[in-house]
């Protein structure tokens, strides 16, 4: 594994990595994270009883929109034309948590790890925003890259 930081020049200045000589290949990234909430909040989400509306539906759209706009949020992130993206939710009533999984796909010269991570993060923040009136103790956490496929560095599995 190459441990060299790529977003700095030899003087320590931040730069956007030059990907012009890289090959376009299919790249896939999967990220995940959780929102822990009270059992009452989880039940309100499951029964679509949150006053602001369909929590998971809105969070799904927000996460996908975030993936498409990642380069506007992360300064050195390249803009990419995402070819596929999804946000999925798994509610675990025993743990009182919602697991969010974001998948991002592209055929490009650079990967989409940041897009998947941003999708999870914004979906989680949207859940928090929509439910904060009933539960201010929600905890967003465990956001990480699960899998990366394609590109020069090959496959990564957490």
Swiss-Prot record:
Binding site for substrate: 76-78, 114-115
GO molecular function: cyclic pyranopterin monophosphate synthase activity
A Pfam family: MoaC
Uppermost EC category: lyase
Biological or metabolic pathway of the protein: Cofactor biosynthesis; molybdopterin biosynthesis
InterPro entries: MoaC, MoaC_bact/euk, MoaC_sf, MoCo_biosynth_MoaA/MoaC, Mopterin_CF_biosynth-C_dom
Reactions that this protein is recorded to catalyse: (8S)-3',8-cyclo-7,8-dihydroguanosine 5'-triphosphate = cyclic pyranopterin phosphate + diphosphate
Keywords: Lyase, Molybdenum cofactor biosynthesis
The enzyme's E.C. designation: 4.6.1.17
Active site: 129
GO biological process, one term: Mo-molybdopterin cofactor biosynthetic process
Assembly with partners or alone: Homohexamer; trimer of dimers.
UniProt cross-references to PANTHER family, sorted A to Z: CYCLIC PYRANOPTERIN MONOPHOSPHATE SYNTHASE, MOLYBDOPTERIN COFACTOR SYNTHESIS PROTEIN A
UniProt record similarity statement: Belongs to the MoaC family.
Functional summary from the UniProt entry: Catalyzes the conversion of (8S)-3',8-cyclo-7,8-dihydroguanosine 5'-triphosphate to cyclic pyranopterin monophosphate (cPMP).
Protein name: Cyclic pyranopterin monophosphate synthase
């Amino acid at each position: 594994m190459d441990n060299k930081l790529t977003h700095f020049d030899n003087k320590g200045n931040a730069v956007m990595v030059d990907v012009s000589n890289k090959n376009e290949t299919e790249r896939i990234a999967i990220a995940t994270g959780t929102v822990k909430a009270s059992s009452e909040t989880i039940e309100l989400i499951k029964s679509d009883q949150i006053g602001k509306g369909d929590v998971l539906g809105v969070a799904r759209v927000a996460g996908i929109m975030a993936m498409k706009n990642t380069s506007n949020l992360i300064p050195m992130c390249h803009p990419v034309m995402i070819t596929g993206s999804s946000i999925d939710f798994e509610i675990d009533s025993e743990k009182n948590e919602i697991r969010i999984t974001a998948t991002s796909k592209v055929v490009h010269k650079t990967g989409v790890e940041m897009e998947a991570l941003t999708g999870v993060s914004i979906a989680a923040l949207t859940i928090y925003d929509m439910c904060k009136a009933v539960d201010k103790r929600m905890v967003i956490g465990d956001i990480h890259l699960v899998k990366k496929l394609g590109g020069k560095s090959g496959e990564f599995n957490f």
